[in-house]
Amino acid sequence: KTLGISTAASPAKPILDKSGYKKGDSTIGVLSLKELLLTAKTLGINKYGMDKNKSFGTGTLNAVNYLLDKWGYQKNGIAGENFIKRLHTEIENKVK
């Protein structure tokens, strides 16, 4: 008897992006992503800061995973096209 407690595993959260920028990447695109993340921090959307450079490090990873979790997705550390579009929409909605 389970006493009303479900023993079924909770369904896995969906994945927002399977490919995109990830920890260890170092490109001008990562710099652009980080500028969006820092703007989001200024607006109170994201709580993590990071260095202003083109390297995807721990600070960027923390910010990406924080937002993925906040939006109901798996924290897989990947910021792809869907992540960037969603982040832009969040920023746009804050500044309207």
Q: PLM ranges: what are they?
A:
Residues D17-T89:
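Short acidic, glycine/serine/threonine-rich helix-capping segments at coil-helix boundaries
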Residues L3-S19, R86-K96:
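Intrinsically disordered, low-complexity Ser/Thr-rich linker and spacer segments
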